[in-house]
Amino acid sequence: MDFLKPFCQYKVLKSVVVGASNQSSVVSRFFGPKITKLIYSTKVSNRDQFLDSLPRGYLDGLASGDFSKIDLLVEQLDFTSAGRLTASLSLLVLVVEEWSARSCVSFDILTELLLVPAWRKIIATAWKGRAPPSADV
């Protein structure tokens, strides 16, 4: 699960998510990392499917302050392959954007609220994929 290694650093994860959002300029996406462009294009091309996959009233619930909905989303994210990582981060970016549009709370704070539990899940997934320590120590 080497593809997860960079995302185990919170700073990298946040940079990619913010870079793939509408908060970022076209120029910064163009000159940014390829993964940011991939997540952005996945988010744009699958927007309707992502929104349809959310339970009815999910975004309105988040906007009204029901933070238990964050856990509901993070539980569904799958970081076990590079493709699933891309799809999960694309969905995460879209949810932050939609939530921000419905809320009076800043995009940065909403990003932090969603990213910390997702980051913890990425770390847990990366640890699950590691080989057990050798008994030859």
Swiss-Prot record:
GO biological process, one term: symbiont-mediated suppression of host apoptosis
A Pfam family: Adeno_E1B_19K
Keywords from the UniProt entry: Early protein, Host-virus interaction, Inhibition of host apoptosis by viral BCL2-like protein, Modulation of host cell apoptosis by virus
Family: Belongs to the adenoviridae E1B 19 kDa protein family.
Protein name, as recorded: E1B protein, small T-antigen homolog
